Amino acid sequence: MIKRTLLYLFAFAFLIQTIFAQNEENIIKEAFDRFSKSPFTSIYSSGGAFYSGDDVDQMPLLINYYMNGTSKYISAVDGLFGGAIMNAQVIKNQLTLNVPEEEPIKDNFNNFSLEAPIMRFPKVYADILDYKFIDLDKKILSSNLTLGKNWHTLKIGYADRVDTIIFSASTYRIRNISIAFMNNLIDITLGSYTTINNIPYPKEFIIKSKTDKRELRYNITNVLAGENAKREAKKLGW
């Protein structure tokens, strides 16, 4: 009788473990399907941001962003004086970055990085504005999923960094993404969601850099998709 009970317990434990493993496999597959590509073919967003760091406190910025297929455009303007801070475009993965009084920078967008830790990986921020969180253009060395009651945690290891994505167990809505590289950690909190063409989209981004204590708070006031995005971007010559 005891042996039979033990057999039942082992069989039950094996069944639970198998179901759990299958559930985890399904969730990680769904996460990769959702987060490795943008749900939009075209998206335009604009809004205001406040930057703190480098002895600057709450410097206002006006930001415009546009993605159309594989092409991306972004501009940042001084929110007080209206002067251009930067504008960039990416065509077929080739970046052209223009900064006042500097020669244009041209580089492969996948490999481009900046010295300032908070802006180390510009492509990450462009992807996030596309609502994309896993970069299949880079080789993924590891992936690990931790299941939670309300929120799941997915860790993606690349050669130069480890991204941690926290998303809703029920809706797959992203709450937070952090980027660990060298001795630094960039933490990005997404909030105040709206819907574009019935697709959830965040209107608030809070970006913090652990090492250099820099912070960028970005609030999107206008976001459009599809033909509406194309029409709005055309007004900027994009």
Predicted regions and their residues:
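Flexible, processing/modification-adjacent segments and terminal tails
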Residues: 22-30, 97-163, 234-238
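Mid-chain, structured segments of secreted extracytoplasmic proteins
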Residues: 70-106
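Bacterial N-terminal signal peptides
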Residues: 8-17
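Hydrophobic lipid-interacting interfaces of membrane-associated proteins
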Residues: 48-54, 79-82, 102, 182, ...
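Extended lipid/amphipathic-ligand handling interfaces
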Residues: 62-67, 88, 92, 189-195
